[in-house]
Amino acid sequence: MTYLNKQQGGIFKNPLVVSLFAILCCALWGSATPFIKMGYKLMFPDGGPDVQSTILFAGIRFALAGFITIVIYSIARKKWLYPKAENLGKIGIVAVFQTIIQYFFFYLGLALTSGAKGTILSGSSSFFAILISSLFFKQEKLTVKKVVACVIGFAGIVAVNISGLEYTMNWGDAFVIFAAISLGISSVLIKIFAKNEDPVVISGYQFMIGGTVMVVVGFAFGGRVDLSDIGGVGVLLYLSLLSAVAYALWGVLLKYNPVSKVTIFSFMTPVFGVLLTALMLPEESNVEIISLIISLVLVCLGVFLLNFTGFPQKEKTEPQPVLDNGNTPDEGDCDSTVIESGVISNSSK
C-alpha cells in the first residue's frame, strides 16, 4: 500500500476536496498561457520562436518539471523514489501521449491556427477523455447527463472566445484536436496505471522522459533558447513548477475518482487562461466582460450537472412495534429482544 493510499486516499475522494484541487490545477494550467507569452518575449526578443525552438523550450520546461516533482516528493518520503521496474514501459507510454505527442501537436497547431480556435479545440480533451474511458476502456458508463454536461461546458469555452472564432478548418485545427485526443488518452492511462504505481511517480518520470525527448529533438533540428535573461529563466522555472504541481495532483485525483468527475473541470482551464491573460497582458486580450461571465456560468453549470447526484432523501422513521407488555423494543425490563421472521418475543436468561 502506498503512502497516498494510507494517508490521503479518503481525502482525495471527498467531492469538495476534488473540486477545489481540480479547480486549482485548472487555474495553474490557465496561468501558463500568459506566462508562456511572457517567456517568449523575454527569451526571444527578436521575434516569436520557430517550431524547433518552441519544442526545445517546452522540453526544458517539462524535463525540469519532472525533476522538481521527484525531488520534492522524495524529500517528503525521505528516500529517492523510483518507479517499479515492471512499470517503466507504462510510464514511457504515458510520456508519449501526455507530453511528447500532446505538446508537439499543440504547439505546432497553435502556429497554424488562431489563438481563439486553439483554446476552444484544446478544451475538447474532456470530451475525448470521457468517451475513451467509457467506450474503449469500459471504466464507466456513458450517460446522457455526462454528454449534456460536456456540451454545456464546451459551450462555455466557445462563449469566451466567440469574438475570435472563425468557421474554417485547417491543418492547425486538426493538430490541436489531435493533441486534445492524446491528452484524453493519457488521462485514462494514468487512471489505469495508477492502480499499481504511485501517480506522482508516474507524473514525475513521464515528464522527465517526455521532456528529454523534446529537448533532443528541438536541439537536433536547430532550436535555440536564450537562458541569459534572468526574467526568462524565472518564467521557465514557474512554468516547470506549475506543471509539476498540477499534473501530480491531477494524477492523484484520477487515481481515486472516475475519469469523468475529474476531467469535466478541464473546461475551466481555457477560461482561466483568458481571464489571467486579460489581467496580466491586457494588450493581448480583447475579451468582453459579459462573455467571460457567460462562459464561467456555463462551465460551472456543466461541472455541477456532472457531479450533482441529487438532494439527500430524508430518512423515514418506521413505527416501532409494540410488545405484549405495551413497551417498544427499546423499553421494558426484558434482557434481550429477539426478532425472527417478523415476530418479536422476549427471551430471558
Cite the ranges covered by each PLM segment.
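Loop-to-transmembrane alpha-helix entry segments
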Residues: T119-S122, K138-A159, M169-D173, I230, ...
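Specific transmembrane alpha-helical segments of multi-pass solute transporters/efflux pumps
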Residues: S74-A116, A159-N161, S240-N257
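Helix-helix packing/entry segments at the starts of transmembrane helices
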Residues: L24, I60, T99, Y103, ...
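Membrane-interface helix-cap regions at the ends of transmembrane helices
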Residues: T2-N5, M38, L42, A65-P83, ...
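Juxtamembrane helix-entry segments on the extracytoplasmic side of multipass membrane proteins
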Residues: N14-S19, D50-I55, P83-G89, I162-S182, ...
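Hydrophobic/small/kink-forming positions within alpha-helical transmembrane segments
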Residues: A27-G30, P34, A63, A95-I100, ...
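C-terminal-most transmembrane helix of multi-pass membrane proteins
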Residues: T2-F12, F62, I162, F267-K349
